C-alpha cells in the first residue's frame, strides 16, 4: 500500500485521484505534482514502483504544505484573527458564519442545533 505524507493511498484508484486523499491536495494540485515529478496520471496507485513513489514524496515534501503542517497553519491564521480582534475573528469566536451570510434564518450548520428557551411555550389556539 502506497503511503505518502502519512496517508495510505487507495490502491485501486488512479494516482491523480489517490493524491487527493491527502489533506491540502486537490485535483489541480495533484495534476501539477504528477507533471513535475514525471509520473503518468493514467497509472493506478497499485502499479507505482518505488522510484515513482519516491519522486512523488520528494515533490510533495519540497513544494507543498500538507496534512499536519497545513492544519496547524490554518488554525494559527484563525487564532491570529481572533487575537487582533478583527470582525472575522469575532465571528469565529462566537461560532457564527464568517463570510457575510445571513443569520436571522438559516446558519444552522455553524450555530448548531436550536436550544429551547426555558419558560417560553408556544400558544395553542
UniProtKB/Swiss-Prot annotation:
Indicate the quaternary assembly. Answer: Part of the 30S ribosomal subunit. Forms a loose heterodimer with protein S19. Forms two bridges to the 50S subunit in the 70S ribosome.
Q: Choose one Gene Ontology CC annotation of this protein and give it.
A: cytosol
Listed Pfam families: Ribosomal_S13
Functional note: Located at the top of the head of the 30S subunit, it contacts several helices of the 16S rRNA. In the 70S ribosome it contacts the 23S rRNA (bridge B1a) and protein L5 of the 50S subunit (bridge B1b), connecting the 2 subunits; these bridges are implicated in subunit movement. Contacts the tRNAs in the A and P-sites.
Q: Which NCBIfam families does the entry mention?
A: uS13_bact
Q: By what name is this protein known?
A: Small ribosomal subunit protein uS13
The record's annotation in SUPFAM superfamilies points to: S13-like H2TH domain
Q: Which family does it belong to?
A: Belongs to the universal ribosomal protein uS13 family.
What organism is the protein native to?
Answer: Gemmatimonas aurantiaca (strain DSM 14586 / JCM 11422 / NBRC 100505 / T-27)
Amino acid at each position: 500500500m502506497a503511503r505518502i505524507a502519512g496517508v495510505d493511498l487507495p490502491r485501486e484508484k488512479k494516482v491523480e485521484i489517490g493524491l487527493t486523499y491527502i489533506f491540502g491536495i486537490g485535483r489541480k494540485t495533484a495534476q501539477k505534482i504528477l507533471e513535475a515529478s514525471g509520473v503518468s496520471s493514467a497509472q493506478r496507485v497499485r502499479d507505482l514502483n518505488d522510484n515513482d513513489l519516491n519522486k512523488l514524496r520528494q515533490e510533495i515534501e519540497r513544494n507543498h504544505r500538507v496534512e499536519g503542517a497545513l492544519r496547524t497553519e490554518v488554525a494559527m491564521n484563525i487564532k491570529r484573527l481572533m487575537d487582533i480582534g478583527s470582525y472575522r475573528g469575532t465571528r469565529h469566536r462566537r461560532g457564527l458564519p464568517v463570510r457575510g451570510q445571513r443569520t436571522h434564518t438559516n446558519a444552522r450548520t455553524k450555530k448548531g442545533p436550536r436550544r429551547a428557551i426555558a419558560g417560553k411555550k408556544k400558544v395553542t389556539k
